[in-house]
């Protein structure tokens, strides 16, 4: 696979290219902090683009992100690096929805948009307890959380209760990587079963 070559300053060019999009074109945005992000986005991106026929933007900090060479006409991809161009991207974002698997929104240099009312969605990149691997308050500033299971929902609601936080919308989404493996395993078992039946018949 041949990746586009980015040189110094290209992240700012990519940011300007993104900022020229209409509000309709930039309505749904995914942000990938690293290569692992796509493991958690894949199912949702497929649902949005292939089943719901929606257009999305995919913004990444990874130079060799495979999505930068995607042939899917419903996906516009942008590389913004992980420096000041990324900081500006978040501060000036104009989108209806931003989906990411990076925690600590508003805790450090990654902030909510100062110019537009964006709805922020967090997707877990682990099945473990919220308290076992995330900093305190790591997901407090998101509007919607895609939870792996009931344990995440219970932990988040308890945290909101204890710290008197604004309730977030919680959706039981599952775990992308595991769900993909389960689907692949089910397909393999069906193929294996058919192969065995053919052997018996012959």
Predicted regions and their residues:
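Polar low-complexity intrinsically disordered regions
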Residues: 1-5, 48, 197
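Membrane-proximal basic amphipathic "stem/tether" segments
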Residues: 1-25, 34
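Nucleotide-sugar donor-binding and catalytic loop/hinge architecture
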Residues: 17-26, 183-202
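Active-site and donor-binding regions of nucleotide-sugar-utilizing enzymes
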Residues: 29-183
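Serine/threonine-rich low-complexity intrinsically disordered regions
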Residues: 7-9, 20, 65, 69, ...
